[in-house]
Curated annotation (Swiss-Prot):
UniProt cross-references to CDD domains, sorted A to Z: DMB-PRT_CobT
Protein's organism: Shigella dysenteriae serotype 1 (strain Sd197)
Tagged with keyword Transcription regulation: no
This protein's name: Nicotinate-nucleotide--dimethylbenzimidazole phosphoribosyltransferase
GO biological process, one term: cobalamin biosynthetic process
Entry annotation: catalytic residues: 318 (proton acceptor)
NCBIfam families for this protein: cobT_DBIPRT (TIGR03160), PRK00105.1 (NF000996)
Biological classification of the source: Bacteria, Pseudomonadati, Pseudomonadota, Gammaproteobacteria, Enterobacterales
Pfam families, per database record: DBI_PRT
Enzyme Commission code(s) on record: 2.4.2.21
Annotated Gene3D superfamilies: 1.10.1610.10, 3.40.50.10210
SUPFAM superfamilies (alphabetical): Nicotinate mononucleotide:5,6-dimethylbenzimidazole phosphoribosyltransferase (CobT) (SSF52733)
InterPro entries the record matches: Nict_dMeBzImd_PRibTrfase, Nict_dMeBzImd_PRibTrfase_bact, Nict_dMeBzImd_PRibTrfase_N, Nict_dMeBzImd_PRibTrfase_sf
Function: Catalyzes the synthesis of alpha-ribazole-5'-phosphate from nicotinate mononucleotide (NAMN) and 5,6-dimethylbenzimidazole (DMB).
Length: 359
């Protein structure tokens, strides 16, 4: 069986020649050069991904939702009962949650994966990759062992690669877990070097009078566990959670197949920061769907060098933003593959990117 290091070494580089060809093709389409801006840039980015073989296209779509509980819930950093994780995961299997609605609209399948829900028995209908019944309380101990983190990463990478073999070409990540914005903030603080006060937000409607405690919990977790910001696995194992590890695994797995993965909100930014520490080569495969309303979102995205496509003031999680942005990916592919060409219409435009066909 391949090790994590072996799999990380298989992540292919983006193909600059394919991107150059895509740029020339797009510049010849029936529009002023550059007039579709970020949509054009997205199509060119997709063309450079080896898994799409130089032609931006979307086959099957999948949103992978990592579900887990967190020991740090005991510190009073969330107002929702811990049992909500299992209840909502079960609702996902019925197709009744927010991500299920948005994924259905986008034509994507939702894979609900138990990586650490705190229930006595596995929940029927979930994909069972459970490591433990919740992670450790990061305010008093590591979230998990390094071995547990590496094994879960490998399991999720392999699952993602298997989906790719079965025709999935566009992945989205999501999560579900009460109190999980606390470890996410700890990861963001650790890797960006920003103070917890700058990145800790209210999560799922935490009252503002409880925010100081949440900031203190994140600060204590980092001080106690001393995660190495240069080592993504170490950060995830010490101050992360199983859902965050799982999302990082999807990113690494998709990138190893040369395929795009849509980020969701703040939790996914944290997982992406850790994944990029493991392999900077994955960064061109990450597509930011929307700007999370969580406090540390801009800090995390700035560190990643990513600019989201949507700003809907959302902070639901679940992969809702990733599902919502899937039609944008398809739109970029549509203009690339289906638009007419200037030459075929005998239109000659001056080399002015601000020109307009109607001017």
């Amino acid at each position: 069986m391949q090790t994590l290091a072996d799999l990380l070494n298989t992540i292919p580089a983006i193909d600059p020649a394919a991107m150059s060809r895509a740029q020339r093709h797009i510049d010849g389409l029936l529009k002023p050069v550059g007039s579709l801006r970020r949509l054009e840039a997205l199509a060119i980015q997709l063309a450079g991904m080896p898994g799409l073989t130089g032609i931006p296209h979307v086959g099957k779509k999948a949103v992978l939702v990592m579900c887990a509980d967190h020991g740090v819930w005991e510190e009073g950093v969330a107002i929702s009962p811990k049992e909500v994780t299992g209840i909502q995961a079960e609702n996902m299997t019925r197709g009744t949650t927010g991500v299920c609605m948005l994924a259905a609209q986008a034509g994507a399948n939702v894979h609900v994966i138990d990586v650490g829900i705190d229930t006595a028995e596995p929940i029927p209908g979930l994909i069972n990759m459970r490591v433990a019944r919740g992670s450790g309380n990061i305010a008093s101990a590591p979230a998990m062992s390094r071995r547990q983190a590496e094994k879960l990463l490998l399991d999720v990478i392999c699952y993602t690669r298997e989906l790719a073999k079965n025709g999935v070409t566009l992945f989205g990540v999501g999560e579900l877990g009460m109190a999980n914005t606390t470890p996410a903030a700890a990861i963001v603080s650790t890797i960006t070097g920003r103070d917890p006060e700058e990145v800790v937000g209210i999560g799922a409607n935490l009252p503002t009078d409880k925010l100081a405690n949440k900031i203190d919990v994140v600060r204590r977790a980092i001080t106690l566990n001393q995660p190495n910001p240069q080592d993504g696995v170490d950060v995830l194992a010490k101050v992360g959670g199983f859902d965050l590890v799982g999302m990082a695994g999807v990113m690494l797995g998709a990138a190893s197949c040369g395929l795009p993965v849509l980020l969701d909100g703040f939790l996914s930014y944290a997982a992406a920061l850790a994944a990029c520490q493991m392999s900077p080569a994955i960064k061109p495969y990450l597509i930011p769907s929307h700007l999370s309303a969580e406090k540390g979102a801009r800090i995390a995205l700035s560190h990643l060098g990513l600019e989201p496509y949507l700003n809907m003031e959302m902070r639901l999680g679940e992969g809702s933003g990733a599902a919502l942005a899937m039609p944008i990916i398809e739109a970029a592919c549509a203009i690339y593959n289906n638009m007419g060409e200037l030459a075929a219409s005998n239109i000659v435009l001056p080399g002015n990117t601000t020109s307009d066909l109607n001017s």
